[in-house]
Amino acid sequence: MDSQRGIVEQAKSQSLNRQSSLYSLTLDEVQNHLGSSGKALGSMNLDELLKSVCSVEANQPSSMAVNGGAAAQEGLSRQGSLTLPRDLSKKTVDEVWKDIQQNKNGGSAHERRDKQPTLGEMTLEDLLLKAGVVTETIPGSNHDGPVGGGSAGSGAGLGQNITQVGPWIQYHQLPSMPQPQAFMPYPVSDMQAMVSQSSLMGGLSDTQTPGRKRVASGEVVEKTVERRQKRMIKNRESAARSRARKQAYTHELEIKVSRLEEENERLRKQKEVEKILPSVPPPDPKRQLRRTSSAPF
């Protein structure tokens, strides 16, 4: 009985701590809390709104109970550091509200007949949900098993307690076995929080990790290998043609050199023969007698 009473009191304290967050207030109430900033809530973009909410919650005096208070404050501060997509973070609250109304107008006739809440009546958490910044979480009391090695059928007094920090981070905690003491939340590392945010915010993984290289599919890899092989074959064929032209030119030059050497050898031998043979002077020209008539008759 004492353990069941401790579980109920702990659940009540956690619900009160969650209700004290600005995320559960309406936008009119948030405007009242942010009234000192001097800027209208509708003209703020989502990035400025989340930063303002985070700063206001950080400056508020801590009135939480000892049991689970530090974990709830840590989860709310993690909400303020949420990474928004670039196109959505630059939109103002009025523009986001217009987009939400357009999506509602495109729904069914039954949804259009329902009472349409105004912008001031909507909570900040609902605005972020409908804007697509966060996704709704399903309660894990009926589906999730115990965490930390406990069994599902360990007893009626050991019911599973789920602590929800913000609308998109959930972690489990179990009551202490020996005595009903303060429940400490199951530790969630920064890496687990980043994985849960990236998995629940669909379509934002490319924006959050711009440096990550996408894994190439098998078809792209095959095309790349095929192009590389074709390029290698072309390079080999071009190198073979170049070697053939070079060999033909070298062979032609060798033939010309051999012909010139033969001609040079022939001329050298002819010159040596001319030196060995005696030089005969050319014969004198013969004188011929001519008949002339010098006496008259």
Swiss-Prot record:
Taxonomy, superkingdom: Eukaryota
Residue intervals of the bZIP domain: 225-288
Keywords: Abscisic acid signaling pathway, Activator, DNA-binding, Nucleus, Phosphoprotein, Transcription, Transcription regulation
Region (Disordered): 100-119, 138-157, 272-297
Biased segments, Gly residues type: 146-157
Cited CDD domains: bZIP_plant_BZIP46
Organ and tissue specificity: Predominantly expressed in seeds.
Matches recorded under PROSITE patterns: BZIP, BZIP_BASIC
Modified residues (Phosphothreonine): 118
Keyword Nucleus tagged: yes
Subcellular localization, as worded in the UniProt entry: Nucleus
GO biological process: abscisic acid-activated signaling pathway; positive regulation of DNA-templated transcription
Region (Basic motif) residue spans: 227-246
Gene Ontology molecular function: DNA-binding transcription factor activity; transcription cis-regulatory region binding
Residues recorded as bearing Phosphoserine in the entry: 21, 43, 81
Pfam family membership, one: bZIP_1
Cellular component aspect of the GO annotation: nucleus
Statement: the UniProt record of this protein carries the keyword DNA-binding: yes
Residues covered by region (Leucine-zipper): 253-267
Stated family: Belongs to the bZIP family. ABI5 subfamily.
Subunit structure: DNA-binding heterodimer with ABI5/DPBF1, DPBF2 or EEL/DPBF4. Interacts with the AFP proteins AFP1, AFP2, AFP3 and AFP4.
Role noted for this protein: Binds to the embryo specification element and the ABA-responsive element (ABRE) of the Dc3 gene promoter. Could participate in abscisic acid-regulated gene expression during seed development.
Name of the protein in its database record: ABSCISIC ACID-INSENSITIVE 5-like protein 2
Record organism: Arabidopsis thaliana (Mouse-ear cress)
